[in-house]
């Protein structure tokens, strides 16, 4: 299942990622109030980004037993977080938590790799 998650992320395929999101996935942004508490809310944000012309070329920069550190390589970059990185927490082949970090060093530090 982790391979499915990795493949969906690396393809930057919204439908593929949707298939591996837990129904109760939580996405925590870097700013106060940036919080999604369901698959539907996460997908709504993804779809709105696509409608605005945002694209991604994700790179998995670190892989732990149940976590992936991802550089989404957004184009155009996120306005408030141009070096945005994310940690995806996995459980039984599904993404159960997504957490944003302002840059690679802070994301790697959060998983104990710095």
Where does each model-flagged region fall?
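C-terminal and inter-domain tail/linker signature
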Residues: 1-114
């Amino acid at each position: 299942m982790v391979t499915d998650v990795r493949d969906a992320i690396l393809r930057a395929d919204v439908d593929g990622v949707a298939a591996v999101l837990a129904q109760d996935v939580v996405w925590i942004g870097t700013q106060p109030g940036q919080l999604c508490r369901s698959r539907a809310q996460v997908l709504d944000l993804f779809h709105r980004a696509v409608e605005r012309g945002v694209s991604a070329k994700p790179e998995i920069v670190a892989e732990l037993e149940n976590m992936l550190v991802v550089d989404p390589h957004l184009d155009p970059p996120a306005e408030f977080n141009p070096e945005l990185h994310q940690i995806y927490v996995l459980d039984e082949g599904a993404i159960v938590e997504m957490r944003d970090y302002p840059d690679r060093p802070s994301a790697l530090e959060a998983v104990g790799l710095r």
